């Protein structure tokens, strides 16, 4: 009898996280990792007012460039789209760790480094806001309450036993 081969192919990844990590490593186009990067980045950036189209977001992810168009595109839109891809990678790589203020601030640091916000005296990259603001016409938590509210949120989130992640291909920001 022949000995069993030691280089048998590995079994297919079993969890969503395994699939995401494998597709990220393999640079798979059209898989769930590819879709998540584009859809989450496009929708998140549009909530914040980005004017990039879905196709432009996809193009930045796939090529690290943006085609020349007739419309002016804000540099911050391009920077935040590219850094958003890095944030999703960080989340995937840290998915097994408890969610923490340190990770949230690290993601903010990645996202905002190099943007025009980073040049503002009152804006702190990688930390909580210092001034009150609103998003989409809605009031947000006051700066002095952000840390305690985040702690409450993290305590509630990290106490959950079965945290699931679902992706809806039908829900997205208007294009």
What is the predicted function of each stretch?
Residues 1-175:
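FIC/Doc superfamily catalytic core
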């Amino acid at each position: 009898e022949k000995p069993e081969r030691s280089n048998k192919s590995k079994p297919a990844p079993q969890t969503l996280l395994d699939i995401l990590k494998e597709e990220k490593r393999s640079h798979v186009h059209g898989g769930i990792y590819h879709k998540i990067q584009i859809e989450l980045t496009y929708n998140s950036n549009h909530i914040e007012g980005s004017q990039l189209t879905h196709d432009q977001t996809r193009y930045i992810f796939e090529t690290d460039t943006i085609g020349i168009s007739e419309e002016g595109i804000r540099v911050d839109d391009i920077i935040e789209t590219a850094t958003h891809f890095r944030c999703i990678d960080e989340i995937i790589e840290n998915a097994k760790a408890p969610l923490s203020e340190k990770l949230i601030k690290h993601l903010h640091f990645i996202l905002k480094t190099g943007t025009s916000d980073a040049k503002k005296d009152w804006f702190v990259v990688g930390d909580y806001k210092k001034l009150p603001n609103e998003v989409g016409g809605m009031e947000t938590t006051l700066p002095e309450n952000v840390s305690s509210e985040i702690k409450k949120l993290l305590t509630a989130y990290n106490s959950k036993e079965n945290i699931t992640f679902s992706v809806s291909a039908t829900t997205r920001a208007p294009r």
